[in-house]
């Protein structure tokens, strides 16, 4: 149970101070470790490079978007924020950017670390029609899907990136 996991983390941390997010993340990882999981899908809380979830070596990462937010933690430019988010990318693994125009920082991080970098409208794409949307993956998979009840084209970008991760 979650309470048992919190007790284990509290004992293991000793005198180390943890934020609530770090504490809860470690408790979740403890619970995951006791399960027979085929995979785990983790969402970074803030940024990437210094996020508590980043202690896990992932096989694949998805960066949904990069915008000017959380500037007090991530920096005030797209480049500085992209650098923080690039911290989730791993050498010799896949990294997916949901948008069509990845910042140069992501491209250079991928190139210098042997990361298979995939991004929207170059490697995978989607089209929205009146009653459905279509997705095309980098390996030729095509899907006709019902429209989502969520508004905004970015929702389709994010869903497309998730489908690309599944296709890989």
PLM feature spans:
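A generic short alpha-helical patch detector that favors 3-5-residue windows
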Residues: 1, 58, 154-157
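ATP-dependent carboxylate-amine ligase catalytic core
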Residues: 1-56, 72, 80
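A short glycine/serine-rich beta->alpha loop
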Residues: 13-18, 147-153
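Acidic, Mg2+-coordinating active-site environments of NTP-dependent enzymes
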Residues: 16, 35-43, 58-145, 159, ...
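Glycine- and other small-residue-rich loops at beta-strand/loop junctions that grip anionic moieties
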Residues: 21, 95-99, 151
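A generic local secondary-structure boundary/capping motif
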Residues: 50-53, 85, 153
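Short glycine/threonine-rich catalytic loop with a Thr-x-Gly-x-Asp
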Residues: 150-162
């Amino acid at each position: 149970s979650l309470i048992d996991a919190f007790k284990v983390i509290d004992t293991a941390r000793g005198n180390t101070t943890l934020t609530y997010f770090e504490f809860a993340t470690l408790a979740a990882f403890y619970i995951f470790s006791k399960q027979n999981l085929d995979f785990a899908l983790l969402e970074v809380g803030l940024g990437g490079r210094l996020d508590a979830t980043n202690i896990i070596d992932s096989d694949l990462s998805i960066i949904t978007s990069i915008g000017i937010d959380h500037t007090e933690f991530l920096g005030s430019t797209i480049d500085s924020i992209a650098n923080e988010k690039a911290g989730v990318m791993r050498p010799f693994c896949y990294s997916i950017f949901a948008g069509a125009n990845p910042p140069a920082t992501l491209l250079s991080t991928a190139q210098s670390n042997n990361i298979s970098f995939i991004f929207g409208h170059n490697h995978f794409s989607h089209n929205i029609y009146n009653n459905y949307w279509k997705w095309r993956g980098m390996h030729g998979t095509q899907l006709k899907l019902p429209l989502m009840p969520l508004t905004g084209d970015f929702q389709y970008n994010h869903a497309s990136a998730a489908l690309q991760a599944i296709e890989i």
